[in-house]
Amino acid sequence: MKTKLNVLLLFLFALLLTACQNAKQASHRTDQLRIAWGEDFGDVNPHRYNPDQFIIQDMVYEGLVRYGDKGKIEPALAESWMISPDGKTYTFNLRQAKFSDGSDFNAQNVKRNFDTIFSEQNKGNHNWFHFTNQLESYRALDDHTFEIKLKEAYSATLYDLSMIRPIRFLADAGFPDGDDTNKHNVKKPIGTGQWVVKEKKANEYITFTRHEGYWGEKPKLKEVTIKIMPDAETRALAFEAGDIDLIYGNGLISLDTFVQYAKDKKYVTDVSQPMSTRLLLLNAKQSVFQDKRVRQAMNHAVDKKAIAKHTFRGTETAADTIFSKTTPHADAGLVPYEYNLQKAKDMLTAAGWKENQEGIREKDGQLLRLQVPYISTKATDKDLVEYFQGEWKKLGIDVVLTAMEEDDYWANAKTGQFDMMLTYSWGAPWDPHAWMTALTAKADHGHPENIALESLPSKAEIDRLIKSALVEPDEDKVDKGYKQVLSLLHDEAVYIPLTYQSVVSVYRKGDFKTMRFAPEENALPLRYIEKSAADKAVKN
């Protein structure tokens, strides 16, 4: 009897061991990827902005063209296109593709999407990019040919059409009643992209399955789950526990944690080339920053090299200008604002701001107190604003920090109720043309840059130069115009360039056969990812 009991126990132990091994292998499925994100995914609407997330929209929906490596515009839903000699007419030959519900993608569907994006009630949301302002007409010539006519030649047209939003295409079955996707949410997120929404739970997760009817090369992965984890430490703990496979993006974990992972042989860490610029925007509409001397003093009061080295642990490089010199038309030969706290103090004193008994500067009864909001879910943003708070206390400036959820942060920015705020250049394919266009545009949904700059004496000249450059066919004149704008912005000192941003990735050694960065920072590199064989992944 005892022997039988021992045999039974041994059998049960073997079953338990097998189950554990299977569970471990299941967590390393070669066709499944689990990642973490800091914000909810929104409504998965291709035409809206916040709260919808770029990475989600890019997975489900496609445009006529897409942004490829080294800035090359590649075919997407348009197989090819022709541009008229005068640069005003674009004719797109559409590929025979299927939406994820099996319906056909065609020129009539393109027109229907254009109709809602650029309707009279909605186009004001999109005048931050110049294509909206230049669009004269569009029409379906036949089932697979779509024509766009512009008011003037606009050389960045294909770059605007490659943007992740808003010019991406929703299937007919996804449109709400009345077709207004800005006013109403989509009935169902149906696109032609590589991924189909399988299941989602607000503020928890969203799971995608591979679009098996995709017109192009299918991803190696079959399923992707994005888990919503607002806290950086929670994301790191989930990764270490094996609950997520990949950390990819900007600000998702603290840089201290990233450095620890880089030293641990269990993990593979990587840093992309610079993709955009991290900026501090000074609101010149606020009384404290109406004096250019104060804005220039603040530019002298930021040790960018220290920020790059200590806050970003060398994963980002110090930025002296709004765009890196590798950005087209951006090398304007500007003289950087040197870090010099004494010079900053002298400039503030010359501007009439004197220290009181508490060590805080004041002028005409007004304290030099700055309201600085930041996004609570971004670990590096918190580190940055706390650095400003401590550094500027030496100058006699009282910095008041306010933590906000991301949606609230940008909603507040659109009202102009801030003294300073962290913002960013947009990276490819938006820099410099679309980013500069936004400086000129009073879009219906608001632009903090436009609000912050509108009181500048040079604002009219900045707008004129940008609008002229956007429709200038001569590349040398375009280059000259953009450099003049950058020189004016540099002199006005409304931006403090901080660092050139990169994307980081972290994963367990042996988990991936292929892994690389996407060409733009607002997309996931899912089309480039292949996981290793399950036995190899489990072994590591």
Question: What are the residue ranges of the model-derived segments?
Answer:
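N-terminal lobe/hinge region of extracytoplasmic solute-binding protein
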Residues: 36-85, 115, 190-191
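Aromatic- and charge-enriched surface segment that lines or borders ligand/interaction sites
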Residues: 79-123, 147, 238, 288-290
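Surface-exposed binding/hinge segments that line
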Residues: 129-174
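Gly/Pro-rich hinge or "lid" segments in bacterial periplasmic/extracellular proteins
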Residues: 163-219, 223, 341-342, 346, ...
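Ligand-site clamp/hinge motif
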Residues: 183-186, 210-257, 386-389, 398-400, ...
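Detector for C-terminal structural segments
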Residues: 201, 301-332, 380-389, 412-540
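Ligand/substrate-recognition segments at binding pockets and active sites
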Residues: 202, 354-428, 503
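Structural transition elements
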Residues: 283, 318-356, 376-383
